[in-house]
Amino acid sequence: MSYVPELKRHYKDNVIKELVSEFQYKSIMQAPKIEKIVVSMGVGDAVKNKKLLDSAISELSQITGQRAVKTKAKKAIAGFKIRQGQDIGAKVTLRGNIMYEFLYKLINLALPRVKDFRGVDGNAFDGNGNYSFGIAEQIIFSEIDYDKIERISGLNVTIVTTALNDKEGKALLSKFGMPFSN
């Protein structure tokens, strides 16, 4: 038998049954699941210093275990000296086993290392069961060597679920162990 991440096994063995009984689904296929996790990092100073973008890509790749891609500006913004199509950030889309491994690492290892951590905001859902939050420093991940980073920067994490509303999405993430503050 091949390797199955701990959170994926937990989802199949426990979470589905709990969600079906809690929300009175007729089938286990109606139970919401995590579709993908998108981790992104905006590097506004990449306009002046291309090395910052390369370091952001390598840091995201180290954190997630998957190669990051550059993101481009959708439109020009004169105030920030950004032209359309210019590289201004990086992102990684995680699916499958890598997604479950990252979620486990985020919930159990990285978030507890945040200074004065009291949980993530429970109201940051988008109305469709998807959850987004920001992390102020990338150094909370153990893969990042503090001495080798060029600058401390934050990153955004979006967890896309198949939940129909925020209540189902919050219940799903709570059962995975997401530490909500409210």
Swiss-Prot record:
InterPro entries: Ribosomal_uL5 (IPR002132), Ribosomal_uL5_bac-type (IPR020930), Ribosomal_uL5_C (IPR031309), Ribosomal_uL5_CS (IPR020929), Ribosomal_uL5_dom_sf (IPR022803), Ribosomal_uL5_N (IPR031310)
Keywords: Ribonucleoprotein, Ribosomal protein, RNA-binding, rRNA-binding, tRNA-binding
GO MF term (any one): tRNA binding
GO CC annotations, alphabetized: ribonucleoprotein complex; ribosome
Membrane-spanning intervals of the chain: none
Keyword rRNA-binding recorded: yes
Any one Gene Ontology BP term: translation
Record carries keyword Lipoprotein: no
Pfam families: Ribosomal_L5, Ribosomal_L5_C
Family per similarity comment: Belongs to the universal ribosomal protein uL5 family.
Function of the protein: This is one of the proteins that bind and probably mediate the attachment of the 5S RNA into the large ribosomal subunit, where it forms part of the central protuberance. In the 70S ribosome it contacts protein S13 of the 30S subunit (bridge B1b), connecting the 2 subunits; this bridge is implicated in subunit movement. Contacts the P site tRNA; the 5S rRNA and some of its associated proteins might help stabilize positioning of ribosome-bound tRNAs.
Subunit structure as annotated in this protein's UniProt entry: Part of the 50S ribosomal subunit; part of the 5S rRNA/L5/L18/L25 subcomplex. Contacts the 5S rRNA and the P site tRNA. Forms a bridge to the 30S subunit in the 70S ribosome.
Protein name: Large ribosomal subunit protein uL5
UniProt organism field: Borrelia hermsii (strain HS1 / DAH)
